[in-house]
A protein has these predicted regions:
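Intrinsically disordered, low-complexity regulatory segments
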Residues: 1-155, 161-164, 223-230
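Prokaryote-biased recognition of long, low-complexity C-terminal linker/tail segments
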Residues: 158-226
């Protein structure tokens, strides 16, 4: 049984507007009539560009990697709507995606709305079904700091690498952009393509012997002796 009363006035925050209608219906089917479901439409907070930081990234490596976070101007209207609804709700349920990015997104929403632990719960579900959401409501929790740190570290590394190396790559080799994953992935593709282009076909043979015993046929492959195996 959930510790969240069905008589409570709830604000449920999801990521995508496409989920609002379905999640609203499921909550009402579960008996939560006083529910409002709103979408954050993705991240509400981003790293601010800052000329006084490393490569204008808004990241300060010399200050224990302090980050200049800022509310995304494109989300002002969304945030105002979330703030207004959170003020009249008994509880805010942060139902962003159940992964590290969803955890970071939810944590930034918690900070923007200035929610303390008595005002919100974090709920996680892996499918938008009545059963999954019911289970999530029976097991509400709070933000996972370690997942948040992991997501924010990913954002920091992405921006530091991209901002520092993209201008250089554009100037010297005409690359469109440089990224933490895309550049490493591209190198693997290029290395593999070079192997294919440089491949020289060689003939080799396999030696098989067929045996018959008691009208049953056996086929064996010669792979060498106990001391030395045949390469080809």
């Amino acid at each position: 049984m959930s510790i969240i009363s069905k008589n409570s006035k709830l604000l449920v925050i999801v990521e995508s507007p496409n989920k609002v209608k379905t999640v609203t219906k499921i909550f009402k089917d579960l008996g939560y009539e006083k529910v409002t479901v709103l979408a954050s439409v993705g991240h509400t907070t981003k790293i601010k560009d800052n000329r006084n930081s490393y490569k204008n990234t808004g990241i300060h490596p010399d200050e224990d990697f302090r980050v200049d976070w800022v509310t995304d101007p494109e989300k002002y209207k969304v945030i105002e709507q979330l703030k207004a609804q959170s003020k009249v709700a008994d509880f805010v349920l942060i139902a962003s995606d159940p992964d590290r990015e969803g955890e970071s997104l939810g944590n930034h929403i918690k900070q923007v709305l200035r929610l303390n632990d008595s005002q919100y719960f974090r709920i996680k579900y892996h499918s938008i079904t009545k059963e999954a959401i019911s289970t999530a409501l029976d097991n509400p929790g709070y933000m996972n700091k370690y997942l948040c740190d992991a997501a924010e570290s990913r954002q920091i590394v992405d921006k530091m690498i991209g901002y520092a190396l993209t201008p250089v790559a554009k100037a010297y080799i005409g690359a469109k952009s440089v990224g933490r994953c895309q550049s490493a992935g591209l190198k693997l593709v290029v290395d593999r393509e070079k192997e294919i282009q440089n491949f020289i076909p060689e003939y080799y043979y396999d030696l098989f012997v067929e045996f018959t015993k008691d009208d049953i046929k056996y086929r064996a492959k010669y792979i060498g002796t106990a001391d030395k195996k045949v390469d080809r």
